[in-house]
Amino acid sequence: MSDSLRIIFAGTPDFAARHLGALLSSQHKIVGVFTQPDRPAGRGNKLTPSPVKILAEHHGIPVFQPKSLRPEENQHLVADLNADIMVVVAYGLILPAAVLAMPRLGCINVHGSLLPRWRGAAPIQRSVWAGDEKTGITIMQMDIGLDTGAMLHKIECAIQPEDTSATLYDKLAQLGPQGLLITLQQLAAGTALAEVQNETQATYAEKLSKEEAKLDWTLSATQLERCIRAFNPWPVSYFIVDEQPIKVWQAQVLPAGEDAEPGTIIHADKHGIQVATADGVLNITQLQPAGKKAMSAADLLNSRREWFIPGSQLV
């Protein structure tokens, strides 16, 4: 059997486009690309193609953008391509059982965690949020469940104390294509080994929300610092002062000092704005007022010191 596979690629964001790029540089043939419909974006809300569509069209690959793969006429789009396998990376649409069964080798997915931990929509962010020491990439055979399929390949990645979701995203976007190419080689050769997931170890990575990004001072400083890193670059943690949302991009955990109600400003100087929490002190070092660029605590205090008077409360 040839080690060159006929591949349908399904994906939408930049993370997916990096995997498509690796496939385009391989011996495999991309026979079609599925991506989500163009969406309004930018200040003018202009219809904008996904990064995957842009890359596919640049290489002259047929692009399909159905709103759903449930209708039979859309499923025929997959069947007619006569693919050996379908590779799915952050596509954003559910694949019905009929579609999963169409390619000769089925459908495989690149997932941004070490399954079965962090199944679901936001695995990278939740691993930072939870304080995990490691995460990684899992390549799995897709079934009708939510990230429940048998695992074909895993690559681990340490989470550093300073990692944000943005930096971890970049690390996994480099590891994922490596694991994908190895898995495809094994599938083509018939040497791939599938490991069933242990359901007792499964956890779920719920989608992030803007509401969740509001800093809750009744949490510990450690958990708040994790939230700040997990919600970077979106939706970005924030608090309210003078009825204005202030985004927080960087902060440090300090040991507890004087007793104070959570949310109380303990101290504010060029080194940061220190806020009492349920356990420990959060020292905020980089902030972004509404309509402004991100700036150091020192720069914000120069213009808005009245917002951060020691003893006052943040909401």
Swiss-Prot record:
GO terms for molecular function: methionyl-tRNA formyltransferase activity. GO terms for biological process: conversion of methionyl-tRNA to N-formyl-methionyl-tRNA. Its EC number is 2.1.2.9. Keywords: Protein biosynthesis, Transferase. It is an enzyme of class 2 (transferase). It catalyses: L-methionyl-tRNA(fMet) + (6R)-10-formyltetrahydrofolate = N-formyl-L-methionyl-tRNA(fMet) + (6S)-5,6,7,8-tetrahydrofolate + H(+). Belongs to the Fmt family. This is Methionyl-tRNA formyltransferase. It comes from Yersinia pestis. The lineage of its organism: Bacteria, Pseudomonadati, Pseudomonadota, Gammaproteobacteria, Enterobacterales. The gene is fmt.
